[in-house]
UniProtKB/Swiss-Prot annotation:
Mg(2+) 1 binds at D7, D140. It is an enzyme of class 3 (hydrolase). The RuvA-RuvB-RuvC complex processes Holliday junction (HJ) DNA during genetic recombination and DNA repair. Endonuclease that resolves HJ intermediates. Cleaves cruciform DNA by making single-stranded nicks across the HJ at symmetrical positions within the homologous arms, yielding a 5'-phosphate and a 3'-hydroxyl group; requires a central core of homology in the junction. The consensus cleavage sequence is 5'-(A/T)TT(C/G)-3'. Cleavage occurs on the 3'-side of the TT dinucleotide at the point of strand exchange. It comes from Dictyoglomus thermophilum (strain ATCC 35947 / DSM 3960 / H-6-12). It catalyses: Endonucleolytic cleavage at a junction such as a reciprocal single-stranded crossover between two homologous DNA duplexes (Holliday junction). Binds 2 Mg(2+) ion per subunit. Homodimer which binds Holliday junction (HJ) DNA. The HJ becomes 2-fold symmetrical on binding to RuvC with unstacked arms; it has a different conformation from HJ DNA in complex with RuvA. In the full resolvosome a probable DNA-RuvA(4)-RuvB(12)-RuvC(2) complex forms which resolves the HJ. This is Crossover junction endodeoxyribonuclease RuvC. GO terms for biological process: DNA recombination; DNA repair. The active site is at D7, E67, D140. The gene is ruvC. Belongs to the RuvC family. Its EC number is 3.1.21.10. Mg(2+) 2 binds at E67.
Length: 158
């Protein structure tokens, strides 16, 4: 099962692609889709759509996962995350894929075992579970990989 996870934003969208086969979780690819701050919102969203579509074409994932938008004190940030989420959902829909939405609590519980885990604890567990040399950077990438791990564990009933 190939799972792609996204931590959306208009400036940086982290992504991770994992393959679950038998009892093993293997990293296929991970990275960040970034846009210059001087680009218009339309140009940023168009670029994000094209890049997400390319990843979906290339890897043909069985599942697409994103984190639920949480309440953010900065309304501008919350709106920009929502716009990026909409673009990812549209790209997935055009590839006949539904997007599974996980809450931060679900991700922390499944990856760390504690719903109030810190970002550092989640990132450490991502590194350990995937047997990576270093914690993926930027944080958005580690978050996207955590979403994939959480989705896989959820499918296994963990």
């Amino acid at each position: 099962m190939i799972v792609i996870g996204f931590d959306p934003g208009t400036a940086i969208t982290g992504y991770g692609i994992l393959n679950k086969e038998d009892d093993k979780i293997a990293v296929i690819e991970y990275g960040a889709l970034t846009t210059p701050s001087n680009w218009s919102i339309g140009r940023r969203l168009n670029y994000l759509f094209d890049q997400v579509s390319s990843l979906l074409d290339l890897y043909n994932p069985d599942a697409v996962v994103m984190e639920e938008v949480f309440f953010n004190k900065n309304i501008k940030t919350a709106i920009s995350i929502g716009q990026a989420q909409g673009v990812i959902i549209l790209a997935a829909q055009q590839h006949q894929r539904e997007v599974s939405i996980l809450t931060p609590l679900e991700v922390k519980l499944s990856v760390v075992g504690y719903g109030r885990a810190t970002k550092d604890q989640v990132q450490y567990m991502v590194k350990e579970v995937l047997k990576l040399k270093d914690i993926p950077k930027p944080d958005d990438v580690a978050d996207a990989l955590a979403l994939c791990i959480s989705y896989i564990y959820k499918q296994e009933g963990c």
